[in-house]
Amino acid sequence: MTAMAPLVTAMCIAAGVGPSKALLSLLFGAQFGGFVTLVGVGSNATANSVMSELGITPFGFFSITPFGIGICILGTLYFTFIGRKLIPDTGYVPEFAKTDKKPLDKRKAAISVITLLCVLMVIAASPKNMPMHVAAVIGALIIVGTKCMTVQEAIRAIDWNCMLLVGSLTAISTGFKNSGAGDAVAELILKILGEDPSPFMVTTVIFFAAAILTQFMSNIPSIMLFLPIGISIAEQIGVSPYPVAMTITLAGAASYATPFAAPQNMMTVGWTHYKFVDFCKIGLPMLLVTYVVVATLIPIFLPY
């Protein structure tokens, strides 16, 4: 998304139109595409890591793909015919459009693209023999080794705050499960739902609880806190943990409705000057679209 933003902005300026709506379309397009594979967005990979910590076999690279395709299709239709009409063009032009651009280094660009494609193919072909994080590190070493990026640039590119957050929340998620706190919260939710709740009802409640938390807490923390609870609920009602885990993964990635739901949302706010209420207008209906896809496809691809 960051790589595409200058191109989209330049196209809008050349066409004589404001770039804000186009940049918001780029944000939503990136979010829709992130649902298609396990590495499409960071929260998907985080969910897999938490599942491993909880002793559950993680999802495969394309396990999320049927749901992602459904969200892409319905989301694109919604945004094309309804969503983009709900908000105005702010007329703001981001700062990067006003600065001089460096000429493209074709060698570095070619190496970067080829390395990315190779890493993705290795992950997709043999996720058991080549874990995702190992393939990613090898790809990063190739980029640095071929001088596409210096060591200093690579270090600066790491979001250390995010690394610390994920590391600490991984411990909290495991502690939630091992200490029994996840089971206690799961029991409380089941008491609220009443005796013998249907898997559909449980899925619905978990989806909206995780999705709402995501809008204010960001997607990765939401998934890491909810997965132990969701898996405990699945165990207590005697169903497979996979439909519940997939529901939480998709709900956590549905970071549409507030600027705080994902880092790329905050980045887009800086580029467009859209407000909190603008994200709510366009994002809340998209949450319902995502729920429809989840509720429809979970019983088909991940039966309870």
Located regions from the model:
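Cytoplasmic-side transmembrane-helix entry/capping segments in multi-pass membrane proteins
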Residues: 4-7, 21-28, 156-165, 222, ...
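Membrane-interfacial loop-to-helix junctions in multi-pass transporters
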Residues: 14-24, 107-113, 159-163, 190-206, ...
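Alpha-helical transmembrane segments of multipass membrane proteins
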Residues: 11, 31, 50, 54, ...
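Hydrophobic transmembrane alpha-helices of multi-pass small-molecule transporters
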Residues: 63-187, 203, 286-287, 291, ...
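Short helix-coil transition sites and intra-membrane helix breaks within transmembrane domains
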Residues: 1-3, 34-43, 128-132, 175-182, ...
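Hydrophobic alpha-helical transmembrane segments of multi-pass integral membrane proteins
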Residues: 1-7, 195-233, 237, 241, ...
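Juxtamembrane and boundary regions of transmembrane helices in multi-pass small-molecule transporters
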Residues: 14-29, 33-98, 246-304
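Structural signature of hydrophobic alpha-helical transmembrane segments
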Residues: 1, 68-73, 129-140, 188-202, ...
